[in-house]
């Protein structure tokens, strides 16, 4: 199982900026902890961070056929990017949107997430632990989709055998 972890603008400044909102862990520390949890569960992670909308769109599109799911923190682009929302919709795979802070307790302009409409689910307000929650959710969704596909294939094979 492979999951892309895509981080949006200013998340490279975690641990430095607004610690009262985002905590004191750096993005690298969050990734290290997430990597450890993934390895314990046999999951491969690919990490990506960009401050540029087009690069995030490109990375989402590159996920098609190469990963089983996406965990994304679009950061400020959550509230503005139809392009990222459209890219997430286009790849048609499990997507978990993660926000470190509770966007619903923040300024009004931060309380609407455009990208959430293309996400399977949203985790908001649990700090860095939200990424672990996202990993667990994605593993469960991906395993369920694989089980459904296997059952469907077994059913088709059984019907084919009956028709012989």
Curated annotation (Swiss-Prot):
Entry GO MF terms: 3-dehydroquinate dehydratase activity
Record-level GO BP terms: amino acid biosynthetic process; aromatic amino acid family biosynthetic process; chorismate biosynthetic process; quinate catabolic process
Protein residues bound to substrate: 73, 79, 86, 100-101, 110
Keywords: Amino-acid biosynthesis, Aromatic amino acid biosynthesis, Lyase
Catalytic activity: 3-dehydroquinate = 3-dehydroshikimate + H2O
Pathway in which this enzyme or protein is active: Metabolic intermediate biosynthesis; chorismate biosynthesis; chorismate from D-erythrose 4-phosphate and phosphoenolpyruvate: step 3/7
Active site per UniProt: 22 (proton acceptor), 99 (proton donor)
InterPro entries: DHquinase_II, DHquinase_II_CS, DHquinase_II_sf
Enzyme Commission numbers on file: 4.2.1.10
Cited function: Catalyzes a trans-dehydration via an enolate intermediate.
SUBUNIT field: Homododecamer.
Family membership: Belongs to the type-II 3-dehydroquinase family.
Name of protein: 3-dehydroquinate dehydratase
Gene designation: aroQ
